[in-house]
Amino acid sequence: MKLTCVLIIAVLFLTACQLITADYSRDKQEYRAVRLRDAMRYSRVRRQCADLGEECHTRFCCPGLRCEDLQVPTCLMA
């Protein structure tokens, strides 16, 4: 009975340590340059919008346009 209680307490303690460590290291990355490069690449991709007549199923339409689902989703005048 004592051994069972000790094992349960040990498992709970180790679980708590794992959760604390995981939460502490969540936003840390060893290679910051890689993270920065990836962030810059994805921000450029996000800023590119589809112009008038371009497909909009993978990108948003530029301001003043709306995505109209004809046969192929296309950016048209709003």
UniProtKB/Swiss-Prot annotation:
Subcellular location: Secreted
Record flagged with keyword Signal: yes
Database matches in InterPro entries: Conotoxin
Record-level GO cellular component terms: extracellular region
Keywords carried by this UniProt record: Cleavage on pair of basic residues, Disulfide bond, Knottin, Neurotoxin, Pyrrolidone carboxylic acid, Secreted, Signal, Toxin
Expression by tissue: Expressed by the venom duct.
Domain notes: The presence of a 'disulfide through disulfide knot' structurally defines this protein as a knottin. The cysteine framework is VI/VII (C-C-CC-C-C).
Protein name as it appears in the record: Conotoxin ArMKLT2-0312
Source organism: Conus arenatus
Lineage: Eukaryota, Metazoa, Spiralia, Lophotrochozoa, Mollusca
